[in-house]
Amino acid sequence: MKHYIYTLLICIGLSIGNSYAQLTDGLTGLLHMQNAEMQKDGTVIIGGNYLNKHNLPNNNWWEYDSFNYFLNITFLDRIEIAYICTLVKGQPNFNYWPEQTWNKFVNQDRHFAAKIQLVKEGEWWKHMPSIAIGVSDPTTASGGDYTDFNASVHNNGFFNRWFIAMTKHFNLPLGELGIHATYLYNKRKDYPLNDLAFGINLKPAFHKNLNLIAEYDAKTINIGALYSIWADHFNLLFELQDGKYISAGLTYKVNLNGGNNWK
């Protein structure tokens, strides 16, 4: 517990908008878990992350730290789509990988993720939370032309998950508090999901460019922070998965519909 408290204090100490956390998988979310928040209509995000191997879903495929990069677009006010590439090294003693590729980043796993916001926060009822559904990496075939939406085999679909999420924000004297709950499901054998995830985030009143995050992602307890600079165009992400494994990311955000603040 002391370790978690010290880390939160460090995150605050480093940082003496309206930024949302950027999930390490490329969608708007917390750290690992998806939530029901949505970027503004017309927002485009380009980003990348350093991912500790414990942050990756398949230990046989990623037994090493890696990186990803992604493109994220929000349109029609309620739909968000991301395209994510995660770097892969050639593995020794696998026929698929020539010896000259061993332990080198020579390939990448590609997948799509999407989220639809069914209900906006405060819509229909002032206490209504936002509600969203979505999917990450819905296909699993390494060849052929079929799509297995259950992704119950080991081939590809490494990041597969379906989800339904709810988010509610509260304005407190301390700052803006977000409470998030998400049900996650897949049929993966190497990374099964069929559980609830919970998270909170706090944007302190004294410094709203800072976003402190804690979550249980249905597997581990993670803590981290997002820091927004240059009017929310750049966002820096820092995470401790399970309180000890470091991942970090950087995103650039711009809105194609205008209204960008460049000061």
Where do the protein language model's features map onto the residues?
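Detector for outer-membrane/organellar transmembrane beta-barrel domains
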Residues: A151-D217
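Short, surface-exposed linear patches
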Residues: F67-L71, R188, L202-P204, F234-E239, ...
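Cleavable N-terminal export/targeting peptides
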Residues: M1-L27, G259-K263
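Glycine-centered flexibility motif
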Residues: D25-G29, Q34, G42, H180-L184, ...
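Accessory, usually C-terminal, subdomains that scaffold auxiliary metal cofactors
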Residues: E215-N257
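Active-site beta-loop-alpha junctions enriched in small/polar residues
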Residues: T86, S136-P138, T182-N186, D217-K219, ...
